[in-house]
């Protein structure tokens, strides 16, 4: 994986090999208006009361105050700000009108399975419990520790549950050249933080049989629950043979969930940024400043990993991820009960089981500490961030990236940098790419104003029906900050 400083001559970001092939398969028009369909999900989703105890207090870094002097860091002529789109993106070709697709019969079956709280042991936990429609299909089933709570008391998954919106675009796990000048291939894609599943159907099975998640003992147990469900007849009609054997039931369950999770409902492209790309909305000056900092390699350099194309009027070209892997050295989440064991680490990609027939091995120690780069779409709606859920505020995430190298004491209070990676693998952590390549006590690449601007820009990636909620939250925050 290329981790050296990029050339200061600004050129378009190379498209990974998988993306070139995938782009040909994208539909020319993607349904945008999702509100009415999501309301069905929002209304049907069961809610779970937060757990009474978290097993320890959460580490929540305070709002950073980076010295104003940091904004005076010298910038060479070669580090000039990369030009970004104007306030209104040009329309290259006609944009089809938005429509609201009704879920098909097959998609409705998948939705019913997704919401079914009887599919866990003991009952009470559904897919939607950890991938809550109310928080852009992310969340942790009421857990206060940053990782998903399982169906059994005291049991927790290893990681923060990611959003399952836009999963239709995630390619299967594979190795490819990340940049045109690379010699060695790097890992891309796969569902989950470590790419354990190649398809949504395969991904959907994982929590069902995890003892710390939905805790089913066998396919026969799940098949019995499906046969007794209120949607059993619909499942059998839409997926013939689904109830005949446990294996057939599991196959149908995976297919039904895949049909639902890859529907247009789950990839709506209804954010303000999407309207901006279509030429139907303007970004505010603060949001434009954030977009500029997001792209500028002398500032955030976020676009290198969270790829987007502000000059394209097609939102589906801006998924805000390359689906590559990176080791960023996030702080250890000490609110996770299992982390009380100092020898317990989540090694990420290198723990992934190698599948037969694949020439390159993801278990190579150089990938220890690496996790798949998530999409930033709807990131402002999420309640937990990073694979271990250590951050609860989006602003802290941006500040971490900006100051991890320059002010490590803000993030690693116990002295050791990269304290959630074993000593022997800490050299894997990315210290070469912008903005990680600054020395300790150097001025950070981003000052407070830059961080606020990037957060404002990231809020424009919020789809309906979440947009109004983000706007209300921002207004509430502004009101509190101006009140004497």
Question: Predicted regions span which residues?
Answer:
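N-terminal secretory signal peptides that target proteins for export/translocation
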Residues: 1-26
């Amino acid at each position: 994986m290329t981790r050296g400083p990029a050339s200061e001559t600004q050129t378009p970001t190379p498209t990974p090999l998988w993306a070139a092939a995938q782009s040909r398969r994208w539909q020319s028009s993607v349904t945008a208006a999702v509100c009415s369909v999501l309301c069905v999900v929002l209304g049907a989703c069961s809610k779970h009361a937060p757990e009474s105890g978290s097993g320890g207090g959460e580490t929540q870094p305070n709002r950073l105050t980076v010295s104003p002097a940091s904004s005076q860091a010298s910038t060479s002529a070669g580090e000039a700000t990369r030009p970004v789109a104007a306030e209104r993106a040009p329309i290259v070709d006609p944009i089809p009108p938005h429509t609201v697709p009704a879920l098909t019969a097959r998609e409705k079956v998948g939705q019913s399975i997704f919401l079914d709280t009887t599919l866990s042991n003991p009952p009470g936990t559904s897919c939607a419990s950890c991938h809550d429609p109310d928080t852009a299909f992310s969340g942790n089933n009421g857990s206060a520790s940053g990782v998903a709570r399982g169906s059994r008391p005291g049991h927790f998954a290893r990681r923060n549950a990611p959003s399952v919106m836009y999963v239709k675009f995630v390619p299967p796990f594979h190795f490819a050249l990340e940049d045109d000048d690379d010699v060695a291939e790097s890992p891309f894609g796969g569902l989950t933080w470590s790419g354990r599943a190649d398809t949504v159907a395969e991904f959907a099975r994982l929590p069902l049989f995890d003892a710390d998640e939905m805790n089913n003992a066998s396919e026969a147990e799940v098949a019995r629950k499906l046969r007794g469900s209120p949607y059993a007849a619909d499942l059998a009609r839409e997926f013939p043979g689904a109830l005949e054997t446990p294996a057939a039931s599991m196959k149908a369950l995976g297919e039904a969930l895949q049909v639902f999770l890859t529907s247009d409902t789950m990839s709506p492209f209804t954010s303000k940024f999407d309207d901006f790309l279509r030429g139907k909305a303007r970004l505010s000056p603060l949001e434009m400043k954030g977009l500029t900092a997001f792209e500028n390699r002398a500032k955030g350099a976020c676009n290198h990993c969270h790829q987007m194309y502000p000059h394209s009027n097609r939102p589906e070209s801006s998924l805000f991820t390359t689906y590559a892997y990176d080791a960023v050295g996030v702080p250890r989440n000490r609110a996770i009960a299992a982390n009380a064991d100092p020898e317990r680490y989540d090694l990420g990609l290198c723990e992934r089981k190698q599948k037969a027939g694949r020439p390159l091995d993801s278990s190579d120690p150089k990938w220890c500490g690496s996790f798949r780069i998530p999409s930033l779409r709807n990131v402002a709606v999420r309640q937990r961030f990073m694979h271990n859920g250590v951050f609860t505020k989006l602003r802290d995430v941006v500040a971490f990236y900006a100051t991890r190298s320059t002010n490590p004491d803000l993030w690693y209070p116990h002295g050791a940098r990269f304290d959630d990676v074993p000593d022997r693998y800490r050299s894997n952590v990315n210290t070469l790419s912008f903005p990680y390549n600054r020395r300790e006590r150097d001025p950070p690449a981003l000052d407070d104003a830059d961080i606020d601007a990037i957060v404002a820009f990231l809020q424009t990636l919020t789809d309906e029906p979440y947009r109004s909620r983000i706007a209300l939250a921002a207004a509430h925050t502004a009101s509190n900050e101006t009140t004497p």
